[in-house]
Amino acid sequence: MATVTELKAVLKDTLEKRGVLGHLKARIRAEVFNALDDDREPRPSLSHENLLINELIREYLEFNKYKYTASVLIAESGQPVVPLDRQFLIRELNAFEESKDNSIPLLYGILAHFLRGPPDGAQNVLLTESTLHPATKHLSWKPSRRPDDDHVRKDTGPRTTTEELPAAAQAVSR
């Protein structure tokens, strides 16, 4: 008869081979977080920038089937449970989506934009300095304490498309 240790090892191997063990661990972590999370303590209000960033991350996580990670992000950040409208995100980010396949996360299109690099002779300001705060204030800047009138500068460069990163699109198509 097999020992308890041997049975545990066989069970663990079986769950790993089926791809279930990782999902179980993620689900347990999410449930533990939800149990420990104090709903009575109000979350700080999200800045406009954080709302957009969190939504891009949520879209990416859900696309890649990281649903438990996404649930923790929503709970921990105070992001609305109902996702923001994709067209709203595109307008707010000044992005352009040429692809008819709107299932690919906008984050992939943004990545494609930066991998292309700036037009010849132009400096990419978004990568050389922060648009959220001046360089002299970087030590004291706190995202949750920015004034309401502090906004992300709109980039007037070329618009982002999701079709310009075929390698990423192929890598994520399942």
Curated annotation (Swiss-Prot):
GO molecular function: identical protein binding
Bias (Basic and acidic residues) ranges: 145-157
Residue segments, region Disordered: 136-174
LisH domain span: 49-81
One GO BP: microtubule anchoring
Necessary and sufficient for homooligomerization and localization to centrosomes and pericentriolar satellites: annotated span: 1-104
Modified residues (Phosphoserine): 144
Keywords: Cell projection, Cilium biogenesis/degradation, Cytoplasm, Cytoskeleton, Phosphoprotein
Keyword Transmembrane applies: no
GO cellular component, one term: ciliary basal body
Cross-referenced Gene3D superfamilies: 1.20.960.40
Cytoplasm among keywords: yes
InterPro entries, per the entry: FOP_dimerisation-dom_N, LisH
Localization in the cell: Cytoplasm, Cytoskeleton, Microtubule organizing center, Centrosome, Centriole; Cell projection, Cilium; Cytoplasm, Cytoskeleton, Cilium basal body; Cytoplasm, Cytoskeleton, Microtubule organizing center, Centrosome
Family: Belongs to the CEP43 family.
Oligomeric form and interacting partners: Homooligomer; probably required for localization to centrosomes. Forms a complex with KIAA0753/OFIP and OFD1; within this complex may stabilize the interaction between OFD1 and KIAA0753/OFIP. Interacts with PCM1; this interaction may be mediated by KIAA0753/OFIP.
Function: Involved in the biogenesis of cilia. Required for the recruitment of PLK1 to centrosomes and S phase progression.
Name of the protein: Centrosomal protein 20
